[in-house]
């Protein structure tokens, strides 16, 4: 995780990633939200809408037997459909280059990051697996937007363990 640097500015997206560990069971949680103090720039609103759509696309694939690869490809396609890129920026990319630069999610349990991964090599999903679904978009001159929930894989889909809203408002 990157902790950032410098002062926070009004209108800047702030990614808040929390991953508490239960003191008794030693199992981890993981949740990310993005918030903005003050007026939200139009491009941040557009990025946020694309991340929400990508998360919904990923979740529509999750069920027993679906692969982590299929989940990730659904995420990437939603980002591409929204006009964003895929992959790290090249050295000569403009500061406005905006893309998904990581996998869609990961298993979670005793470790915060564990298999299965929701990426291009992601295996078939099993009933009862705990996963995160966390698409994000990142832009060097503006910042990033990510939404992350924990889910449990079920026979016909998933159960979302998070109840926190995913809006951008700081208030």
Predicted features by range, described:
Residues 1-171:
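Active-site neighborhoods and metal-handling regions in enzymes and metal-associated proteins
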């Amino acid at each position: 995780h990157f902790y950032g640097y410098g002062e926070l500015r009004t209108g800047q997206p702030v990614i808040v990633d929390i991953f508490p560990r239960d003191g008794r069971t030693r199992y981890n949680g993981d949740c990310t939200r993005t918030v903005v103090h003050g007026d939200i720039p139009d491009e941040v609103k557009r990025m946020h809408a694309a991340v929400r759509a990508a998360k919904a696309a990923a979740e529509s694939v999750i069920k027993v037997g679906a692969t982590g690869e299929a989940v990730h490809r659904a995420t990437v396609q939603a980002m591409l459909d929204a006009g964003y890129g895929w992959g790290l920026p090249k050295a000569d990319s403009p500061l406005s280059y905006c893309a998904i630069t990581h996998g869609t999610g990961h298993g979670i349990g005793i470790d915060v990051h564990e298999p299965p991964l929701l990426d291009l090599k992601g295996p078939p999903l099993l009933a009862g697996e705990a996963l995160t679904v966390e698409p994000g978009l990142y832009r060097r001159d503006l910042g990033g937007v990510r939404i992350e929930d924990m889910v449990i894989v079920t026979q016909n889909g998933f159960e979302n363990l998070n109840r926190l809203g995913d809006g951008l408002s700081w208030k």
